[in-house]
Amino acid sequence: MMKTLGAVLSLSLTLLSFGGAHAATMSFKNNCPYTVWPASFGNPQLSTTGFELASQASFQLDTPVPWSGRFWARTRCSTDASGKFVCETADCDSGQLMCNGKTGIPPATLAEFTIAAGGGQDFYDVSLVDGFNLPMSVTPQGGTGTCKMGSCAANVNLVCPSELQKIGSDGSVVACLSACVKFGEPQYCCTPPQETKEKCPPTNYSQIFHEQCPDAYSYAFDDNKGLFTCSGGPNYLITFCP
C-alpha cells in the first residue's frame, strides 16, 4: 500500500474510537466475462480471505469498524497436480483459495480502505501502485460528503509497455507491472532520497496509468487525484470490470 494512504490508515486507527461500531458491508460484483478469485488482507483479518466469483456473480462480506485493508482479484486460477491452488495474476502464494494473511503478488489492481468507527470519515481508493491486472471500481453506497467513485475501468494491459508486461501461459499480456515493482528505483518508488512529493513527480510510466485511469492512484503521491472520502457509515460496492 502506498505511503500516503498507509499513514492515513495508521493515524485513523489511532484516533478513532470503537464507539458506535457497526459492520460495513462490502458487496462484490464480477462483470468480467471470466471467473475471478477475490482476496482480502487487513487488520483485523476478515472472516474470509479468498473466494471464487463467477462471471456476473455477486458476494457480500462484512468488515468490522474501524478496519483497514485491501481487496484484489486473482485471475487464471487452477489447482495443479499436487493439489496446490495457483493463479497467474495476483496470487498470494498460500497454495489454497484462502490467502490467510498473505498479500497478492504484484502486479495487482487494489481496492484500499480505511473504514472509520462511529460514522467518521472513511478513506478509499483504487490503486495501480502495485500494477494492474484487471479493471476495478469502488462505489460508496449511502454515506455523506463527497463519496465519489474510485475507478480504473480501462484495460491497461492493452497499452502496457513491453518492459512492464506480464505474459501468461498462453502468450497474452495478463497484467502490467508498475515501474516501482519492475525497477525498484527511488524515482519510481518515491523512496529516499526521493521520498517527498516535490522530489518524486509523476514519471512517463505513471502517466500511462493516469491517462487510462484518472480516478485511480497511479503512483505513491497521487493522493490529490486518487484518494476519496465518505462519512456516515456507508457500505461499498466493489466491481470487477465495471
Swiss-Prot record:
<dbReference type="InterPro" id="IPR017949">
    <property type="entry name" value="Thaumatin_CS"/>
</dbReference>
<dbReference type="Pfam" id="PF00314">
    <property type="entry name" value="Thaumatin"/>
</dbReference>
<dbReference type="GO" id="GO:0005576">
    <property type="term" value="C:extracellular region"/>
</dbReference>
<feature type="disulfide bond">
    <location>
        <begin position="77"/>
        <end position="87"/>
    </location>
</feature>
<keyword id="KW-0964">Secreted</keyword>
<dbReference type="InterPro" id="IPR001938">
    <property type="entry name" value="Thaumatin"/>
</dbReference>
<comment type="function">
    <text>May be involved in protecting plant tissues from pathogen infection.</text>
</comment>
<dbReference type="GO" id="GO:0006952">
    <property type="term" value="P:defense response"/>
</dbReference>
<feature type="signal peptide">
    <location>
        <begin position="1"/>
        <end position="23"/>
    </location>
</feature>
<feature type="disulfide bond">
    <location>
        <begin position="152"/>
        <end position="213"/>
    </location>
</feature>
<feature type="disulfide bond">
    <location>
        <begin position="147"/>
        <end position="230"/>
    </location>
</feature>
<keyword id="KW-0732">Signal</keyword>
<feature type="disulfide bond">
    <location>
        <begin position="32"/>
        <end position="241"/>
    </location>
</feature>
<dbReference type="InterPro" id="IPR037176">
    <property type="entry name" value="Osmotin/thaumatin-like_sf"/>
</dbReference>
<feature type="disulfide bond">
    <location>
        <begin position="180"/>
        <end position="189"/>
    </location>
</feature>
<feature type="disulfide bond">
    <location>
        <begin position="92"/>
        <end position="99"/>
    </location>
</feature>
<keyword id="KW-1015">Disulfide bond</keyword>
<comment type="similarity">
    <text>Belongs to the thaumatin family.</text>
</comment>
<protein>
    <recommendedName>
        <fullName>Thaumatin-like protein 2</fullName>
    </recommendedName>
</protein>
<feature type="disulfide bond">
    <location>
        <begin position="190"/>
        <end position="200"/>
    </location>
</feature>
<keyword id="KW-0611">Plant defense</keyword>
<feature type="disulfide bond">
    <location>
        <begin position="160"/>
        <end position="176"/>
    </location>
</feature>
